[in-house]
Amino acid sequence: LLDVLFLKSVLFCHEVRMICSPYFLRDALSLPYLNEQNTMNRMKHLICVFLLAAFGSCSFKANAYTERDMLQKAADETTLKNVLVMKQAWVPYPAYTDRAAWDSLMGPNKQRLIAAGEKLLDYKWQLIPATAYLEYERTGNRKIMEVPYDANRQALNTLMLAELAEGKGRFIDQLLNGAYMSCEMNSWVLSAHLPRQSSKRSLPDFREQIIDLGSGGYGALMAWVHYFFRKPFDKINPVVSLQMRKAIKERILDPYMNDDDMWWMAFNWQPGEIINNWNPWCNSNALQCFLLMENNKDRLAKAVYRSMKSVDKFINFVKSDGACEEGTSYWGHAAGKLYDYLQILSDGTGGKISLLNEPMIRRMGEYMSRSYVGNGWVVNFADASAQGGGDPLLIYRFGKAVNSNEMMHFAAYLLNGRKPYATMGNDAFRSLQSLLCCNDLAKETPKHDMPDVTWYPETEFCYMKNKNGMFVAAKGGFNNESHNHNDVGTFSLYVNTIPVILDA
């Protein structure tokens, strides 16, 4: 115990610079006497190894923001304009009326989605009163606003999937109700993010629209509902579709093009500031809205290229080694949302503008499989949860897009023999994308096969395992990383997937 406490104090006293050759550490972990039964000796040996790591003669300075500008190098605005696929011809899903195609795509998901929709036929769309928004500035409680907000959004997404699955019009009235109610809201922004308005208050100000994680996702969902059901809506009353277009334009399209000060776009980024998962997350949602709603080629090209310049800021900020400094819990929103954005961009340009073959993007994807210890445990640096593993359907389609067998096998491994079913929740894009890969994932070989050593020199993460069931994760870094809470020089030790020492 004293040895462990000493190691902890050493690791925290200075920014740890990991030894340049982690393979030395791997070899050290494999020394013959590790097969002895004396667990204490093994642990002491391991601690000595990490002291060597901490005081290694060769240090590695973490790279700062790097002007890669990968997307802008892939195409300028003129090239982009020439390759844009217009009038939603890029959408990879059948038309709502093509029932045979939907039956084929839905497969075993069909009855499950219809049953979920049937539970919402009598759903009462929830009003969010002014006091629910104000509660955030009064007490800091954001849930009182977010719970009914998210219930409405999930209901709208589920009803969309149910109607696409069945195609008989049973869910159209409820979809109409949900879309109409959504348009009647003053804002789709979460109360906790509304203080970014000029008023600095948590009550929506109808005179100003900003884009956050909530409004972007809500706008994308509304854009998909409009795309699939505009014609049946118009048969009932065309005012609803008109109102949807107006709401999406005013809340997403216009502020996206006219406001350079939204921090997550990073157009005014300064050294020392953080660019985190908000960037690809919000940009992926905005890109869906533009590709689904904007049919003027000049305006669309300007919007898409603006998104490319913004996402380049995120790619420039993250480390090229592929690690997610925000931790495994945020991987789906950081690297995962970057993948979503790149997939949408590739689809919207007929595959002409794509970074999915870039090694850096693949490394960002494989970070999740490398960070999985086993039996539900993951390396939880920063404020990530210690248990998880990620969304198998997201991991699979990411892996397939970047040609990573490791990720595809890992996705099947996470299912643990269960059948893959379409994702529901509130994310329309991921729900729809999950339909495209369920059948292939069901046939994939389940395997979690990672190297003995994974070394992230820029982010300063190192993972090591050996044949005796030991898995060690160590972190250098510094405490101005996104979602980091003084995780400077920390480590975790797992034996047979069970956490033994967690330096929390």
PLM features: what roles do these ranges have?
Residues 90, 140-152, 164, 199-215, ...:
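Solvent-exposed loop and edge beta-strand segments that line ligand/cofactor-binding
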